[in-house]
Amino acid sequence: MASTSLLKASPVLDKSEWVKGQSVLFRQPSSASVVLRNRATSLTVRAASSYADELVKTAKTIASPGRGILAMDESNATCGKRLDSIGLENTEANRQAFRTLLVSAPGLGQYVSGAILFEETLYQSTTEGKKMVDVLVEQNIVPGIKVDKGLVPLVGSNNESWCQGLDGLSSRTAAYYQQGARFAKWRTVVSIPNGPSALAVKEAAWGLARYAAISQDSGLVPIVEPEILLDGEHDIDRTYDVAEKVWAEVFFYLAQNNVMFEGILLKPSMVTPGAESKDRATPEQVAAYTLKLLRNRVPPAVPGIMFLSGGQSEVEATLNLNAMNQAPNPWHVSFSYARALQNTCLKTWGGRPENVNAAQTTLLARAKANSLAQLGKYTGEGESEEAKEGMFVKGYTY
């Protein structure tokens, strides 16, 4: 354990704690040092953004009982892959038609508290000429926006990636706020088969922290998402070890950047074996490992944990979420799903106008199932075989 003097002398790490196998965030210097450091951080955070009260209110609204997030922020290229799967061309009109179907589903706001949009969607209108943002707000759904600019190779790493998009982020987030967005999302990834290297983990954590600070300064609640990819043959213990170290580093840099924890949301991966592992985990095992991770690494000041599905089947993602809500948690534990909400809906629609109502009914059924899972009341009865099919894609890009 490092001494207090070492912590004071080295406020900025020049060598990742990943390498040392320790986390500065959870060290315990003298009580006086903790009080002074916390007091200084608290004062800095409150003064850093004039949106502090609004950020807390927005985060609590999204983290409301029985509701979660609809992630519909796929890039136009990824949206094109989805459309291609049902025989449609990747045109703005077709993207608009599917997004209209999603945001205008009657009663969606009963189960969904927030919707993450791609930039095109934030400025887009429905096929009826109404702004997508306005349609969401009318359903009591908070509009959000994807702000990262995607993954690029991380030079000097073991074939790993880093997330770009910090350049110009302050002006973009300010514009997104004016357009009606109230929260933001930044997705970076960690690959277990490729290490992960200390460099990749530190880069991911630092980028998330800078994005979070900038977003809060513009009035947007940042969703912090270091996705640990499902790729690999590793067991659940290996996933846990990596996740524990990743989240330690993330929170260390969030604190360094004076990010207000009450005004953020997390979007973690569930702790599962690698998708190519011979071992499979039950929902109870996934819940046990995941909740242990959260309790060891996530401060209770964070209002909401909104899990990503990461290629799990629709049913698997819902069952795992339900298992995590069988006992009280210090945070709102819910969902932020894309494919695990949209997949069956997309196939039901098939690009045909006459199928819109049926597709919306399918979307609502999936959203309701996850709403029940957030309350710990999902039974899994009546699920189709299609909803049980896994959606893992090796090397998946978003």
UniProtKB/Swiss-Prot annotation:
It comes from the Eukaryota. Highly expressed in rosettes leaves. InterPro entries: Aldolase_I_AS, Aldolase_TIM, FBA_I. Residues 1-46 form a transit peptide. Disruption phenotype: Reduced growth rate. Unability to accumulate starch in leaves during daylight. The active site is at E225 (proton acceptor), K267 (schiff-base intermediate with dihydroxyacetone-p). GO terms for biological process: gluconeogenesis; glycolytic process; response to abscisic acid. Can be trimethylated at Lys-394 by LSMT-L. The methylation level has no influence on the ologomerization state or on the kinetic properties of the enzyme. Phosphorylated on tyrosine residues in response to abscisic acid (ABA) in germinating seeds. Pathway: Carbohydrate degradation; glycolysis; D-glyceraldehyde 3-phosphate and glycerone phosphate from D-glucose: step 4/4. Its main location: plastid. The modification Phosphoserine is found at S157, S215. It is found in: Plastid, Chloroplast, Plastoglobule; Plastid, Chloroplast stroma. Substrate binds at R95, K185, S309, G310, G311. The record marks Y398 as: Necessary for preference for fructose 1,6-bisphosphate over fructose 1-phosphate. Induction: By glucose and sucrose. Induced by drought stress. One of its GO terms (cellular component) is chloroplast stroma. Keywords: Chloroplast, Glycolysis, Lyase, Methylation, Phosphoprotein, Plastid, Schiff base, Transit peptide. GO terms for molecular function: fructose-bisphosphate aldolase activity; mRNA binding. The modification N6,N6,N6-trimethyllysine is found at K394. Its EC number is 4.1.2.13. Plays a key role in glycolysis and gluconeogenesis. Homotetramer. Belongs to the class I fructose-bisphosphate aldolase family. This is Fructose-bisphosphate aldolase 2, chloroplastic.
